[in-house]
A protein has these predicted regions:
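Bacterial signal peptide processing site
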Residues: 17-20
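Beta-strand-rich extracellular modules
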Residues: 78-80, 131
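C-terminal motif of bacterial Sec signal peptides marking the signal peptidase cleavage site
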Residues: 12-15
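Exposed beta-strand face motif in extracellular beta-rich ectodomains
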Residues: 71-73, 124
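Sec-dependent signal peptide recognition
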Residues: 1-9
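Aromatic-rich carbohydrate-binding modules that target alpha-glucans
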Residues: 27-70, 80-106
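Short, exposed beta-strand-loop hairpins at the edges of beta-sheets
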Residues: 115-141
């Protein structure tokens, strides 16, 4: 019985610490840590025009022109220094974003790039959304 209680306590502690860690990361983004859209469209550089802006509580976005329809663009949300805790990529192996459909993301994603293939050339809004239980990325056609 003690073993069962110990196992349950361990699971609860680990679950709480990972949830707390996720909130710490969200709070850092909210409180001034600067993220950029970094990828094929920026030559993987942290360019000022691709700085992610907070658009509402726990929601961040940036617009980017994608000039080639049908081309797969690889990208991440990351700070200028590629700090692991501020390096967001896909949480699902080899998953691709579809227009207007959220995809889970995670920090500490060293090689897990996000990817999106637009059906038409144009300006798109890339969003990082912390409002739900787990963070997601979303791409919309900009208005």
């Amino acid at each position: 019985m003690r073993l069962v209680i110990s196992l349950i306590a361990g699971v609860l502690i680990v679950g709480c610490s990972s949830q707390s860690n996720q909130h710490d990361i969200q709070d850092r983004v909210s409180s001034g840590s600067v993220l950029f859209l970094r990828g094929d469209m920026t030559n993987w550089d942290a360019l000022p025009e691709y700085k992610v802006q907070q658009t509402s509580t726990r929601l961040f976005s940036v617009k980017a022109n994608l000039p080639e329809a049908g081309k797969t663009y690889h990208f991440k949300f990351a700070d200028a220094q590629w700090n692991p805790s501020m390096n967001y990529g896909t949480a699902i192996d080899d998953a691709a974003l579809s227009l207007n459909r959220p995809l889970p993301v995670r920090a500490y994603s060293y090689l897990d790039e996000l990817k999106f293939t637009p059906e038409q050339a144009g300006t798109y809004e890339f969003m990082l959304d912390f409002r739900g239980h787990k963070p997601v990325a979303l791409v919309k056609l900009a208005q």
